[in-house]
């Protein structure tokens, strides 16, 4: 399935049905009074969050959606049938913006949440409404209301408790595959991860959701590489796990580059709690590990944890620390 997190679609409510011009007809009654019924209300357009969905792919190829029109009024004071509302399901984490993307109309953060974005048009009045002492046989009726229409922008921000960040090939996908049942594509070259991957981590009787974000490179917040497109998916998370490739010649530069991209993208990311991990320690000597940890701790003023996603050394400790950090923020 394609991962689609940005779409623009057209939506329109159903028009109201027209009122009816009709007169009562009955045997032995030549001139019955007006009995034209009202038009039915048009259907509304409603968005609903659905936890079974994780992409906006349903809106990639079909981009025009219109609710059902109300039926016209009928004789014998019968109202037209109301049009069916159109319910459009979206993943949790979907945001609805105006066409230009400047106005947030709604943000879905829980399952089975509904938002009526367009009301259907009101039905027109039948001629029975216009009978008066001076006009016993009115031929007046009103037309149904034309419903609102608009283009909107849908943007999906994945909901996760923990975000995995780091340079391409830092070992994020391997980390995710070990701590969850997720099966991300893994290979020994940069940009293996082309879309965000989500997984659920179970710790005893507790759990949390973790997201592997495609690797960041210098200039990601300006659209370079893949990071700019996916940085938004970790804005909602509580904790960042920052993996650094221990085999790199300059771990401090790698750390600073990723931090700059996070800080340049938004203040939300800048202020996230960060767990720093020096990965691939299985290919380093004890002296090399300590030297690189010392360098990182000097510039970060934070504890740096040595791990190996190849041997899984130290990974369980990070998982428990992440869970503890999440719980402390609740």
Curated annotation (Swiss-Prot):
Keyword flag Amino-acid biosynthesis: no
UniProt enzyme class: hydrolase
Pfam family, one: GTP1_OBG
One GO process term, biological-process aspect: ribosome biogenesis
Localization, UniProt: Cytoplasm
Binding site for Mg(2+): 173, 193
UniProt-recorded Gene Ontology molecular function terms: GTP binding; GTPase activity; magnesium ion binding
Domain of life per record: Bacteria
Entry annotated with the keyword Oxidoreductase: no
Residue ranges constituting the Obg domain according to the UniProt record: 1-159
Domain OBG-type G intervals: 160-327
InterPro entries, alphabetized: G_OBG, GTP-bd, GTP-bd_Obg/CgtA, GTP1-OBG_CS, GTP1_OBG_dom, GTP1_OBG_dom_sf, OBG_GTPase, P-loop_NTPase
Cofactor: Mg(2+)
UniProt main location, coarse: cytoplasm
Keywords associated with the record: Cytoplasm, GTP-binding, Hydrolase, Magnesium, Metal-binding, Nucleotide-binding
EC number: 3.6.5.-
Residues that hold GTP according to the record: 166-173, 191-195, 212-215, 279-282, 308-310
One cellular component term from this protein's GO annotations in UniProt: cytoplasm
Quaternary context: Monomer.
Family per similarity comment: Belongs to the TRAFAC class OBG-HflX-like GTPase superfamily. OBG GTPase family.
Job description of the protein: An essential GTPase which binds GTP, GDP and possibly (p)ppGpp with moderate affinity, with high nucleotide exchange rates and a fairly low GTP hydrolysis rate. Plays a role in control of the cell cycle, stress response, ribosome biogenesis and in those bacteria that undergo differentiation, in morphogenesis control.
Protein name according to UniProt: GTPase Obg
Species of the source: Rickettsia massiliae (strain Mtu5)
Encoding gene (name): obg
């Amino acid at each position: 399935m394609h991962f689609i997190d940005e779409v623009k679609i057209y939506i329109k409510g159903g028009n109201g049905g027209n009122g009816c011009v009709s007169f009562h007809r009955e045997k032995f009654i030549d001139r019955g009074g007006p009995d034209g019924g009202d038009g039915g209300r048009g259907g509304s357009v409603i968005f609903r969050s659905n936890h079974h969905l994780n992409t906006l792919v349903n809106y990639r190829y079909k981009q025009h959606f219109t609710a059902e029109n109300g039926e016209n009024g009928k004789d014998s004071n019968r109202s037209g049938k109301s049009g069916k509302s159109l319910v459009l399901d979206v993943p949790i984490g979907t945001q609805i913006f105006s066409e230009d993307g400047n106005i947030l109309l709604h943000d879905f953060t829980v399952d089975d949440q509904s938002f009526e974005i367009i009301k259907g048009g009101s039905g027109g009045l039948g001629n029975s409404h216009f009978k008066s002492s001076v006009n016993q046989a009115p031929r007046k009726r009103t037309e149904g209301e034309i419903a609102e229409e608009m283009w909107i922008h849908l943007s999906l921000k994945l909901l996760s408790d923990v975000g995995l960040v780091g340079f391409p090939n830092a070992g994020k996908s391997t980390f995710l595959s070990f701590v969850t049942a997720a099966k991300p594509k893994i290979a020994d070259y940069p940009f293996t991860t082309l879309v965000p991957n989500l997984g659920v981590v179970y710790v005893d009787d507790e759990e949390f959701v973790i997201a592997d974000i495609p690797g960041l490179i210098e200039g990601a917040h300006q659209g370079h590489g893949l990071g700019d497109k996916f940085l938004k998916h970790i804005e909602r998370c509580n904790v960042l796990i920052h993996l650094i490739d221990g085999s790199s010649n300059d771990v401090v530069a790698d750390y600073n580059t990723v931090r700059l991209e996070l800080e340049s993208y938004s203040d939300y990311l800048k202020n996230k709690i960060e767990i720093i991990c020096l990965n691939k320690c299985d290919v380093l000597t004890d002296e090399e590990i300590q030297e690189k940890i010392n360098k990182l701790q000097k510039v970060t003023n934070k504890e740096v944890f040595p791990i190996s996603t190849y041997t899984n050394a130290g990974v369980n400790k990070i998982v428990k620390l992440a869970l503890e950090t999440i719980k402390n923020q609740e």
